[in-house]
Amino acid sequence: MKVIDQYVSDRVSLYNGDSIEILKGLPDHCIHYAIFSPPFSSLYTYSNSDRDLGNSTGDDQFYQHFLFLVKELARVIMPGRLVSVHCMDIPKMKSRDGVIGLKDFPGELIREFENAGFIYHSRVVVWKDPLVEATRTKALGLMHKQLCKDSAMCRMGLPDYVLTFRLPGDNPEPVSHEAGLSRFYGEDEPKGIKGARPEPDADLVAKKEKYNTEPVYSHQVWRRYASPVWMDIRQSNTLNRTAARDEKDERHICPLQLDLIARCLELWTNPNDIILDPFAGIGSVPVVALQMGRRTMGFELKESYFKQAVLNCQKEENHDDSNI
């Protein structure tokens, strides 16, 4: 396995290096689930490494290189198990693309995974505040003054998406929730009866009146998780990324929301499953995996992010959340 540096303990393995090369060193079908946020083509610059997918010369080169990663994922994921990808539509910029518009990044990713043999399993929209986007990006299409001037150029804000793909085959280790869902990840937790619903009142049944009017907690949680739009992901609930910024960074990273990670792990993994993030950044996925009793593996090319990921995982292993 070609790595620059590594941190390995009983439940976590972190590697500083090229994710595609590291994946080649893993045995077949050894990963239960993968979740990650890939470089968004050349939208962000993460490092000056030639191996960084974010430094592709254009979209065609990015997708050509990304397919190598997807093919390796198809080899290491267990049959019947899943890979989830966080993504969004990519803005077209007049200075770079010649026009103002959007690129269908999620659609391209779906085609990449299907070309590698995966089955397109699901998509969920993660709501984001358009005012926050407008303030951060100054996008013309979100400006109120543009609405007043010529609303033909106005657009909606850009949500996040979580695309999930399934590797064909029978799942040898079913993901079971025999007692339903007993916890909730997100804001505004639903209310309801936890555990078995009590027996109905015989008198009310005889009178044909309502009984068991209080909802079951697991049903309410599943209703929220099964929604095609997740309105309840806390956008600010992320790992502290301050320590991972270099002076040479052109743009800082935006770590994945912890609620989103936890929700996916709750739905699609068992305790002690091995969770992979091939673009681990500062360790958001490994940290949540450890918190939820999973084993985890993460790859990160950039040294400063890798070192911060190690610190974050060590703090979680030592139950010290002072920097999270």
Regions found by a protein language model. Give the residues of each.
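Core catalytic lobe of class I
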Residues: M1-Q308
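Class I S-adenosyl-L-methionine-dependent methyltransferase module
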Residues: E108-L109, V310-I324
